């Protein structure tokens, strides 16, 4: 079953909340010596609507109820999220991003497509194994975790290839002939973002939780992204009219890989993002 999405409801307030969450994680990164003050300046959902195919409608996962109760009773949701993320970090699959970059004059396309092996499960089976099998029967679920009328969880296959964009800024340090001899302003624009994955949306009381389910079978040394399939990178180093360097592939690769890693860590189950 396919549905129409009111994409315009993802307004500036939600975009800013997402930008702030990503920027908080960026600020905690260990940066190379030549990159300083890396931060996200803007995020825009764009106007292109993803293709969404509903795979299942069911009761929300009980663990989402636990978090909803904690967040309602807590004065600091961010602290609760941080605690949860640290506890769940060991549950996340190995991460990496394959970069088959096509370097053009002022841009880089980072393609993360993969070939699925015959023994891999379908997105539907993965979603069922990762979500449904973890949900106890109602008799096994404590009464305070049982869903109320109207609570629902939607599992859907989402394909997106649109005009979503994100802008970043940083300073590149020139350490020759001495340390920090010069600081060059660096701007980076991420666009042509392609997403393909199984999305879970849980509506619980007044809260909306979203996350992706990893549909890849990860092996040691696996360098594939389960969600992001492509990103175009446009970068400028130096003043716009006095460019010193172009296509700083090493910096672009680092930034894109870290962005993809954050997406995997923060938006792939058992981690999730609360829209409201």
From Swiss-Prot:
Example of a GO MF term: lipid binding
Secreted in keyword set: no
Chain segments carrying region Disordered: 68-104
GO biological process: mitochondrial genome maintenance; mitochondrion-endoplasmic reticulum membrane tethering; phospholipid transport; protein insertion into mitochondrial outer membrane
Compositionally biased tracts (Acidic residues): 75-89
Domain of life: Eukaryota
Membrane topology field: Peripheral membrane protein
Keywords recorded for this protein, A-Z: Endoplasmic reticulum, Lipid transport, Lipid-binding, Membrane, Mitochondrion, Mitochondrion outer membrane, Transport
Record localization: Mitochondrion outer membrane; Endoplasmic reticulum membrane
Domain SMP-LTD span(s) in chain numbering: 1-276
InterPro entries named in the record: Mdm12, MMM1_dom, SMP_LBD
GO CC list: endoplasmic reticulum membrane; ERMES complex
Main localization (coarse): mitochondrion
Biological role stated in the UniProt entry: Component of the ERMES/MDM complex, which serves as a molecular tether to connect the endoplasmic reticulum (ER) and mitochondria. Components of this complex are involved in the control of mitochondrial shape and protein biogenesis, and function in nonvesicular lipid trafficking between the ER and mitochondria. Mdm12 is required for the interaction of the ER-resident membrane protein mmm1 and the outer mitochondrial membrane-resident beta-barrel protein mdm10.
Domain remark from Swiss-Prot or TrEMBL: The SMP-LTD domain is a barrel-like domain that can bind various types of glycerophospholipids in its interior and mediate their transfer between two adjacent bilayers.
Protein family membership: Belongs to the MDM12 family.
PANTHER family for the chain: MITOCHONDRIAL DISTRIBUTION AND MORPHOLOGY PROTEIN 12
SUBUNIT field: Component of the ER-mitochondria encounter structure (ERMES) or MDM complex, composed of mmm1, mdm10, mdm12 and mdm34. A mmm1 homodimer associates with one molecule of mdm12 on each side in a pairwise head-to-tail manner, and the SMP-LTD domains of mmm1 and mdm12 generate a continuous hydrophobic tunnel for phospholipid trafficking.
Record-given protein name: Mitochondrial distribution and morphology protein 12
